[in-house]
A protein has these predicted regions:
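Non-catalytic tandem-repeat scaffold regions and their flanking low-complexity/translocation tails
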Residues: 1-192
Length: 192
């Protein structure tokens, strides 16, 4: 991964043309995939996404981000995927955020933690259609998980002064019976 990170840094140079930068993307990805430790690969995804965000020219940057999303999806469910999603959520294009959201909810056992940074990035776009799209997905989860995710969405929407109708809090009310007591308590403390 160190090679991948170094190559990615070189791609930020204005002296490199876009075609060369685009040719290096698969080399960078191959170098990343040589890493066997999931936590280190997740860390590298963050470093490379930050560096690629500084590349001049959009074509190679878009290809790199697309590959980073694929590498993130290839990580095993767990803390490494949470870390990768946290580091990449604020750096991908708005159109790719629903894809990251799916990777987060597929991170079994850590869905809520993995979804937080992605939901934050989605709310940050203020794209009401996208927010409505993920909101319907949130309500389809198990009651406990749905309440956790809707609580997070509600908090972020309030912080961003987004007027969602119905609110995420209102959508969570019918799910409270099936949610864990601690989850309900947390929701109530955030609602006040």
């Amino acid at each position: 991964v160190y090679r991948a990170e170094a190559l990615c840094g070189l791609c930020a140079s204005d002296e490199m043309d876009e075609d060369d930068r685009a040719e290096w993307v698969p080399i960078i990805v191959e170098s990343m995939l040589e890493e066997e430790r999931a936590w280190r690969l997740a860390e590298s995804i963050g470093i490379i996404s930050k560096s690629a965000g500084n590349w001049p020219g959009a074509r190679a940057r878009k290809a790199m981000m697309s590959n980073l999303i694929a590498v993130t999806g290839g990580l095993p469910a767990g803390e490494a995927r949470v870390d990768a999603l946290k580091s990449i959520s604020g750096k991908v294009s708005e159109q790719r955020l629903p894809e990251l959201f799916l990777l987060a909810v597929e991170n079994h056992g850590m869905e809520a933690k993995a979804s937080r940074p992605v939901i934050k990035a989605i709310v940050g776009t203020k794209n009401l259609d996208m927010i409505a799209e993920i909101t319907s997905s949130l309500t389809e989860a198990t009651p406990d998980l749905a309440v956790k995710l809707l609580d997070n969405l509600h908090r972020l929407a309030v912080e961003s002064n987004l007027g969602l109708h119905p609110t995420a809090l209102e959508l969570s009310l019918p799910l409270l019976d099936g949610a864990d007591f601690e989850t309900v308590r947390t929701l109530c403390s955030h609602a006040s």
